[in-house]
Each structure stands twice: as structure tokens, then as C-alpha cells.
Amino acid sequence: MKTLWKNCHIASMAHGKYSIIEDAAIVTSGALIEWIGPQAALAEPEHDNCIDLDGAWVTPGLIDCHTHTVFGGNRSGEFEQRLQGVSYAEIAAAGGGIASTVRATRAASEDELYASAERRLRHLLKDGVTTVEMKSGYGLDLENERKILRVIRRLGNTQPVTVRATCLAAHALPPEYADRADDYINHICNDMLPALAAEGLVDAVDAFCEYLAFSPAQVEQVFITAGQLALPVKLHAEQLSSLGGSSLAARYKALSADHLEFMTEDDAIAMAAAGTVAVLLPGAFYFLRETQLPPMDALRKHGVPIAISTDLNPGTSPGLSLRLMLNMACTLFRMTPEEALAGVTFNAARALGMSATHGSLEVGKVADFVAWNIERPADLAYWLGGDLDKRIVRHGVESSI
């Protein structure tokens, strides 16, 4: 069906800029954009449907490119403990931290995980998100990583959102492999990744390169295996220390390296040369009260594309609003509203390997967009929370969330 969406202003985000079109219109044909431009330049179109957007500002659908949406349990009790003076080490020694999430996730059924993840996902969708990446990583064995990835696929098949599934088996060391990190990495490479990829459950492979997780050498083994399986890679890197993980990611042409508070200028140079996107996660920075900022000057100087995401997870960023992350990126990292919006559209699509079809409003791309009742695009980063008045269009069809 061909639809004319008229009477709007557009921030198309082409090339990662606002790329504003005033007094504009969009023609969609099925799920794709057929025409976009000033309404006055549109010849009398043939269309089956005409929708008046009442002067709204239209942006691409938002893309949350780094989340851990599927997990069992709840760690708000630990949050309260930390604020009462209990250290993270004490919480972990008592069986808390990521170990508690792994236990709860392993104990939960697929249906239970789906139900809790669906509730969290609906918050993102109400914020204007039309594409989301979700990681495994709280199962840490084949059976439970498969369970999480199956839930992720199910969410993509049942909810009005495009979902990309990332296998993060190399997230932490499971209890049954205590003090045997090399053995666990071998298990991931020899058993888990080949099986999960063969079942069609994996779109990309991620790992956590950090002193409290896995070394660059161990991560490299995972990357080599991913390459043999023709799967792109991503990396949690330089969140708490500088181990050269982001340069390692660049060497393997990773889609993205994420967190990056402790990355160096040499890392930025390597990422720019490889086209690897820097995914910044202001929610985790805020929640952990970090003080080391990502090197924004180096990222800008060398032209590294910058994306923003919620990092939705139970331990370090229980963030249910991608728009709130826009404000945090501007306030904490001193990004401009234009940079921040590019970070959840154009560059977020690049971070998922989807830039040919998503992330900007251009002819031939997927017709995912949001018509916002706002005065200017910067309002999306300006307002702190709240459900802004909007109309969400996915694949050329208005969606009711």
C-alpha cells in the first residue's frame, strides 16, 4: 500500500546530521520510503492513503543498539544495600552481583523470561524505539544461553520492533568454571557458538574485555571463532581500565566497541580506520558514579562515529528510556543534541550493521519513523523523561504501543 504522510518537518539524519527538510512530506510504499522532500516539490501523487501529521517533527525510529533486556530476577535490593554502605565486594561475596542474575536467569522458564523482558521492552517502544539489540550473557552455559536467545528471537517475532540478537556468552565466568577462564573460553568457541549459530539464534558475537572479565587474548579467540562462523563482532571495552580492547575490536573490524571511558587516542585512531562505532553508555556511567569520561575530543578529532544506548541491564544501568540517555549524553559527555540524536539513529544503525536499511530517512530505506509533537529536534534531548506526544510508524504502518 502507498501512503502519503504530509504536513510535517523532517530531521532525516542523513549522514548523521539533522538534514532538516521544512514543510515536508514522505511517501511510503509498503515497508519502504519511496519519496521524501519538500511537500511543494511533490507531484500529484498516487496513493492509497493520506495522513496529515499536523506539523509534527519527524525523525527516524530510534535504535537502542546495546541492551541486556532478557534476564531473571531483580537487583534493586543490592542498589539499596550499596547506598547503605555495603561494598560491591561484600555483595558479591554473599552471592550477589552478576552471579545472582545468572542464578535467577537459569531458574526462570522461557515463558517467564519472555514476560519480564516484554514489560521492559514496552517502555522502550513507548519512547519511540523501533529497533533494539539484545544480548545474552546471563545464562553462561549452552542450555541457558540458548534459552535467552530464543526469548530474544520470540520478542522480535511477536512485538512491533526489529530485534537483533547478540551472543554474549563471554560476559563473565560461570561458577562451574571458577578459576578456569581459558577452559570456559574454549567451551564457548568449540561448543556454544557453533551450536547457537547453527540454530540461527545469533546475529553478532560480543565479549567483555576487562580485568574482572576476560583478557584480550581470550577475547581474540572468541573473535576468531565468530569470524569462522561468518558472524560480526562487538566488544565491551575500556569501561574500567585500559587493556587495548577497542584497538583489538578495530583489528577484527568490529561493528562497535562499547563503554570506552578508558580508551586512548591510539584506540580512537584504530577505530576510525576500521569504521568501528563507539557506543557510549551514559546510564552505566551515571549509575556507577564513574568519574572517567570517554575521550570525546579524541573521538571527534579522528571521526569515530558515536552511538548512544541504554545498556538496559539489572546491575549497572536499569534504564528504560532511550530519550533519557540523550539528555545524559549531552549533560554528562557534553555531546550536542544533534550528535546525540545521530547516536540513536544513524550511528546506532551502523553499530548493528544496518545502515543500508535503517537509521536515516532516505529513499529506499525502511519506513520506520516517529512524528513528534515538539518545537524542534533538540527537544528530544532537552526534556527529562515523560511520554512525549508522538505517532510511531514501523514498516510504513502506524503502530499503537
From Swiss-Prot:
Residues involved in Zn(2+) binding: 66, 68, 236, 311
One GO term of the biological process aspect: L-histidine catabolic process to glutamate and formate
Zinc keyword on record: yes
Binding site for 4-imidazolone-5-propanoate: 75, 138, 171, 239, 316
Required cofactor names: Zn(2+); Fe(3+)
Enzyme Commission numbers on file: 3.5.2.7
Class of enzymatic activity (EC top level): hydrolase
Protein location: Cytoplasm
Residues reported to bind N-formimidoyl-L-glutamate: 138, 313, 315
Cofactor binding annotation: Binds 1 zinc or iron ion per subunit.
One GO MF term: zinc ion binding
Predominant place of localization: cytoplasm
Binding-site residues, Fe(3+): 66, 68, 236, 311
Keyword list, A-Z: Cytoplasm, Histidine metabolism, Hydrolase, Iron, Metal-binding, Zinc
Pathway: Amino-acid degradation; L-histidine degradation into L-glutamate; N-formimidoyl-L-glutamate from L-histidine: step 3/3
GO cellular component: cytoplasm
Catalysed reactions listed for this entry: 4-imidazolone-5-propanoate + H2O = N-formimidoyl-L-glutamate
Function: Catalyzes the hydrolytic cleavage of the carbon-nitrogen bond in imidazolone-5-propanoate to yield N-formimidoyl-L-glutamate. It is the third step in the universal histidine degradation pathway.
Entry similarity comment: Belongs to the metallo-dependent hydrolases superfamily. HutI family.
Protein name: Imidazolonepropionase
The organism of origin for this protein: Pseudomonas syringae pv. syringae (strain B728a)
